[in-house]
Design a protein with these regions (language model features):
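C-terminal structured domain segments across diverse proteins
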Residues: 113-114
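Short beta-strand/loop motif that positions the catalytic acidic residue
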Residues: 139-141, 145-148, 152
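Alpha/beta-hydrolase-fold enzymes
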Residues: 2-107
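Active-site nucleophile elbow and catalytic-triad environment of alpha/beta-hydrolase enzymes
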Residues: 117-136
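Glycine-rich phosphate/ribose-binding loops and adjacent secondary-structure elements
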Residues: 1, 148-149, 164
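Conserved alpha/beta-hydrolase "acid-adjacent" motif
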Residues: 153-162
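Catalytic histidine-centered segment of alpha/beta-hydrolase-like enzymes
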Residues: 154, 177-191
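Short, conserved loop/helix-junction motifs that constitute active-site signature segments
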Residues: 136-141, 167-172
Length: 191
């Protein structure tokens, strides 16, 4: 059958709330608009657009686990000193990708904060897209797999698995869930 794989997504962000969830629920939407939305400067492509800048997203990622990143860079330095170029190259590859964060359109970011984290419209059965109600229970002939990271500090354990609760039309035989032990949010996507 057709299949749908959901990985590390906050389908129901009320399950196992993380620091990300708490920030989104403790601040009103206007706070995000005033504090994290910026205009792309004139000398950059996309000038004049309102965005949630990639550098702020990156700063947020680093701020969630500063000790881990400091230790990772210390280990990288030690690998270079020891001549362990394989581990040093693995560090470089990881951070080349981890640091590649793009600006997000303001409309998308703010709508995500409101719909997913503040109003929980999908799990409450109240999300409309283009004037039509989204009804996950209507999915019948598509297999569903959900994947979560045991240590995910962005989409907590249970937030993605919640898709199974919403997709009531999918037979049990066409459902599977995997919790990747020892994996965080980035880890479930990077292996």
């Amino acid at each position: 059958p057709r299949s749908l794989v959901m990985m590390g997504g906050p389908i129901d962000s009320r399950e196992s709330p993380t620091a990300v969830n708490n920030l989104a629920t403790q601040k009103p939407l206007w706070w995000f608009e005033q504090n994290v939305i910026h205009t792309v400067p004139a000398n950059y492509p996309g000038r004049g657009r309102q965005v949630y800048p990639g550098f702020l997203q990156h700063l947020g990622f680093i701020a969630m686990n500063p000790e881990r990143h400091v230790m990772s860079h210390w280990d990288f330095y030690q690998d270079l000193v020891k001549g362990d170029l394989d581990d040093a190259d693995a560090h470089r590859r990881f951070y080349d990708e981890y640091n590649a964060v793009l600006d997000m359109p303001a409309e998308y970011y703010l709508d995500t904060i409101r719909v997913v984290f503040q109003e929980h419209l999908l799990p409450r059965g109240l999300w409309d897209v283009a004037g039509e109600r989204v009804t996950p229970g209507a999915i019948r002939e598509t297999a569903l797999m959900t994947i979560e990271g045991e240590l995910d500090d962005i989409a907590g354990v249970g937030q993605t698995r919640a898709a199974h609760r919403l997709c009531t039309g999918i037979p049990e035989a066409n459902r599977v869930h995997l919790t990747a032990q020892g994996a965080g949010h980035y880890g479930i996507f990077s292996g």
